[in-house]
Design a protein with these regions (language model features):
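Cell-envelope/extracellular polymer assembly enzymes that use nucleotide-activated donors
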Residues: 2-4, 22, 32
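Glycine-rich, basic loop-to-helix element that forms the pyrophosphate-binding segment
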Residues: 63-79
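Conserved donor NDP-sugar-binding/catalytic core segment of glycosyltransferases
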Residues: 98-127
Length: 174
């Protein structure tokens, strides 16, 4: 399995359908989708179950509410993919995104990949590209720190072994 996409779910009935639809349109042979039910109290999981019915590449993990970080960590622990992508339930990904990532990984093998984000303001419907300068290949750490300040996890695709071997998990309670 190339990629595990971890989607934490907690009271996101307004968004989770769009998120899952964008993920379910990716090739089943390349990715698994791990939905982590973090004890949601709304109808999010009913929406999830309805959408994922019949898909063999979707797994659902149920846990009591422990917060976003612990939900992501649970997904990481269950991930079967060589790479892991943490996608929040109010995010959508572009069509062919997983195939594109697969091609990039084949061309430029490394432990962490960073991507652009298209941010949409819900109130104004304005959109802007964060991380607008595109690069491909390798970027030394010191140059990355000078140019980019990207702290959102959905921007990064990680080699699972890199995270596990270095004991890199999300900090509980954050």
């Amino acid at each position: 399995m190339f990629l595990s996409v971890v989607v934490p779910v907690y009271n996101v009935e307004r968004y989770v359908g769009d998120c899952l639809c964008s993920l379910l349109n990716q090739p089943e042979s390349l990715c698994e989708i791990i939905v982590v039910n973090d004890g949601t109290k709304d109808n999010s999981m009913e929406i999830v179950h309805k959408l994922v019915n019949g898909y063999t590449n979707v797994r659902i993990i149920n846990q009591e509410n422990k917060g976003l970080s612990e939900a992501r960590n649970a997904g990481l622990r269950h991930a079967l993919g060589e790479y892991v992508w943490f996608v929040d339930s109010d995010d959508t990904i572009l069509e062919n995104a997983v195939e594109y990532l697969h091609d990039i990984v084949d061309t430029y093998p490394c432990d962490v990949y960073a991507s652009n984000l298209l941010i949409k303001n819900e109130k104004t419907n304005e959109q802007y590209l964060e991380f607008a300068e595109f690069f491909s290949g390798y970027l030394p750490t010191e140059q990355y720190g000078e140019k980019y300040n990207g702290t959102t996890s959905q921007r990064y695709i990680f080699r699972k072994k890199f995270l596990i071997d270095n004991n890199l998990f999300f900090m509980p309670g954050v």
